[in-house]
Structure formats: structure tokens, C-alpha cells
A protein has these predicted regions:
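Active-site loop-to-helix "anion-binding N-cap" substructures in soluble metabolic enzymes
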Residues: 1-176
Length: 176
């Protein structure tokens, strides 16, 4: 989940906490020979391309954190993304442009989900904050590819499970 807070004037990332949280899964995949295609939404562009909501600054920050190039696709399922995905080698990572620049993402458009899935061999869900959403990049893609939980999702589920299975008393749960 790279939906990170940004400075409204400059577009500069003001907290990279969510990017850092994704690093264990990304590093695990890269170190084990995967070619990684990362994707995320940023903000609510409602299907329109908006420069302030591009994921280019996220690709730059992710590159700094990983200490390696993060290839950035200037589209989502267009020619740039497809060509870069096809050329991706094991141990390389690419980030697609903001998924919500395409209106079909939030509508769980089957054709959009299918096009996303055609660039990959499997799907790793590592955005705990979005797993409940029936969007093309989550529920839709999982219809076409073998799907797995990433390390962050696994960690969140483990923490929740422990809290619910054997909570310290007194115990109050507020879920939203």
C-alpha cells in the first residue's frame, strides 16, 4: 500500500512508513529470484490522470530504500507497462502508475483485472489496509492468478489473531 501522505504544494512524500512496511516482502521476493511488479493507488483521482497523484515519487523513494533501480511504468496496462513487464528480469522491480487513474480499478472491472494479471505469474497481497476492497487489483486479479499473503498481511493477521485468541484483560475491541 503506497497510498502515502504528500505535501499538497510540492507532492513530496511526508511519510514513507507504508513504503517501509512493504520492504520485507519486496526484498524476500527479489532475493528469491522474482521479478516484482508492484502496484498501488494514491489518493482519489476518480479515473483521471492527475500529476499530483502520480506514483513517480513513490518509485523514487522505493528505489532509495532498496538501493536499486525501481523501473517506473508511465501507465498501468498500456504499452509502457506491458513492454517493461516483459523485459523485467529476476531480481528487478517495476512500479505501475497509480491504479486509480483507471476508473475500472475501483469498479473491479474484469477486463482491467485480467489485463493486470496477464503481466504476472502470481499475486502477492501485502496491503492489509486494502484487502477488504473488491477492486480489480485485489479481488479481481486473484481470480486469474495463484494468490498469496505477503509478510505484512501475515504479520497483521497474526497480531489480530493473538489479540482475539488470548487477549490481556480487561479487553476492548473497536473495529471499523
Amino acid at each position: 500500500d503506497f497510498n502515502v501522505p504528500q505535501n499538497k504544494e510540492t507532492g513530496e512524500i511526508t511519510s514513507d512508513k507504508r513504503i517501509v512496511a512493504a520492504l520485507p516482502t519486496i526484498k524476500y521476493l527479489l532475493e528469491n529470484g522474482a521479478a516484482v511488479i508492484a502496484c498501488s493507488h494514491l489518493g482519489k483521482p476518480k479515473g483521471e490522470w492527475k500529476e499530483k497523484l502520480t506514483l513517480a515519487p513513490v518509485a523514487k523513494r522505493l528505489s532509495e530504500l532498496l538501493g536499486m533501480e525501481v523501473i517506473f511504468a508511465k501507465d498501468i496496462i498500456g504499452e509502457d507497462a506491458k513492454a517493461k513487464a516483459a523485459a523485467l528480469k529476476p531480481g528487478q522491480i517495476m512500479l505501475l502508475e497509480n491504479l486509480r487513474f483507471d476508473i475500472r480499478e475501483e469498479k473491479n472491472g474484469d477486463d482491467f483485472a485480467k489485463a493486470l494479471s496477464e503481466m504476472a505469474d502470481l499475486y502477492v497481497s501485502d496491503a492489509f489496509g486494502t484487502v477488504h476492497r473488491a477492486h480489480a487489483s485485489t479481488a479481481g486479479v486473484a481470480k486469474y492468478l495463484p494468490a498469496y499473503a505477503g509478510l505484512l498481511v501475515e504479520k497483521e493477521l497474526s497480531v489480530m489473531g493473538k489479540a482475539l485468541d488470548n487477549p490481556a484483560r480487561p479487553f476492548v475491541a473497536v473495529l471499523g
